[in-house]
From Swiss-Prot:
PROSITE patterns tied to this protein: RIBOSOMAL_S8
Record keywords: Ribonucleoprotein, Ribosomal protein, RNA-binding, rRNA-binding
NCBIfam families (UniProt xref): PRK00136.1
GO biological process, one term: translation
Name used for this protein in its record: Small ribosomal subunit protein uS8
Chain's role: One of the primary rRNA binding proteins, it binds directly to 16S rRNA central domain where it helps coordinate assembly of the platform of the 30S subunit.
């Protein structure tokens, strides 16, 4: 049986690992997952990440905690394979009144909603993180 939504699997693995207080989480790698991990690292939600280019490429993400609680309080898939969500610049979501971020896939690459607004481009809303 093949996996239909690999990004939803990535977010679920992160949530489950944080609930179990793991220091890191591993998953099958892809370019999109690596781009999302890079954005999460830039925003301070996760520590470093690495891609092991073995027979099966594996992405390992180091999770961050603050005072014993996970830094990522909530991570939700917005656009899914059955219902894609594309937004223009003015319609990009503000997560938790600007305290969180939305990760957007644009023609210029994967970036946060703030960076997309600053660049004046819209795209597919992949997920929201708070």
């Amino acid at each position: 049986m093949s996996m239909q939504d690999t990004l939803a699997d990535m977010f679920t693995r992160i949530r489950n690992a944080q609930m179990a207080a793991k220091t890191s989480v591993s998953m099958p790698s892809s370019k999109m997952k690596s781009s999302i991990a890079a954005v999460l690292r830039e925003e301070g939600y996760v520590g470093d990440f690495s891609v092991d280019e073995a027979v099966k490429p594996t992405l390992t993400i180091e999770l961050k905690y603050y005072e014993g609680k996970p830094v990522i309080e909530q991570i939700k898939r917005a656009s899914r394979p059955s219902l894609r969500q594309y937004k223009g610049t003015s319609a990009l979501p503000k997560v938790e009144a600007g305290l969180g971020v939305a990760i957007i896939s644009t023609s210029k690459g994967v970036m946060t909603d703030r960076a997309a607004r600053a660049a004046g481009i819209g795209g597919e809303v992949i997920c929201t993180v708070f």
